[in-house]
Amino acid sequence: MRVTILAAAAALAAIAAPAATAGASGSYFLSICQFSHRAADDPIVLPRSPGFSHDHSFVGNLSTNAFSTLGSLRKAGTSCTPQADTSAYWAPTLYADGRPVAPVKAAIYYRRLTTAPVRPFPAGLRMVAGNAHAYKPQSPAITYWDCGLLKTTFYGPNGGGSIPVTPAVSSTVPVCPPKAEGQLHVNFPDCWDGRRLDSFDHRSHMAYARDGRCPAGHPVAVPALSLVYAYPARAVDAARTIGLSSGGQYTGHADFINAWNQPALTKLVRGCLDNGSVSPTLDPTQTYNHC
């Protein structure tokens, strides 16, 4: 079922931060990435098996395919700013009336959600977030859809203006205002077991923090990575059928392989996340680094 989101004015073109609630924002940094390519490949779940996955839309590393390794990724270029981020990011391809819809851009936020100091992701770390086989709404703490950052016009005795409005969260692709962007958000776990770069199910080596603390089995706090894919509303609003390559609209998920220039990532984590406060939310008007 499509969900209609109403706004009194046009939406901002910029990608909105992950949904905000009351409270002060802490520090974070981000990569802004352009769409790179599509392929029925998944180097985490189906390595060395080209064409055997459902279709994915890749951003970041320009070379990501079924055979990708840390070494191959580090030799390739990136669609991200900063250029030091040569990591691989991907999510299922969105289809409107059977036609693939490429994201216009993606934002990858790196936040601190724990009270403990944050360590950089180890080189080559692999993660999966969200459920590709979901048949009902997933927790919005992990994945959700919205219409990005909206502006509402107001008028008063001293003139008018506009204020940002936090968008409504939906479990399915929403119908957005014409200039808005439908956005898929996926939040990755932020606690690591400190030993493995991957695990048999690509999840067991990672965990989500609870109340700002990492569980005993995953004691190492790492950046809380939030991936946001933005799609043009005009490409999906008139469609009769909308789905993801992994199945229905509930199947939002994403994958990540850390291939950052490691010294650059370490500098950002230490200089930004570990010098700031815990940031459970983001300022919805801020779409750039906030350190």
Predicted regions and their residues:
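Secretory targeting and sorting signals
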Residues: 1-24
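Primary mode marks residue(s) on the alpha4-beta5-alpha5 output face of response regulator receiver
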Residues: 25-53, 57-186, 193-291
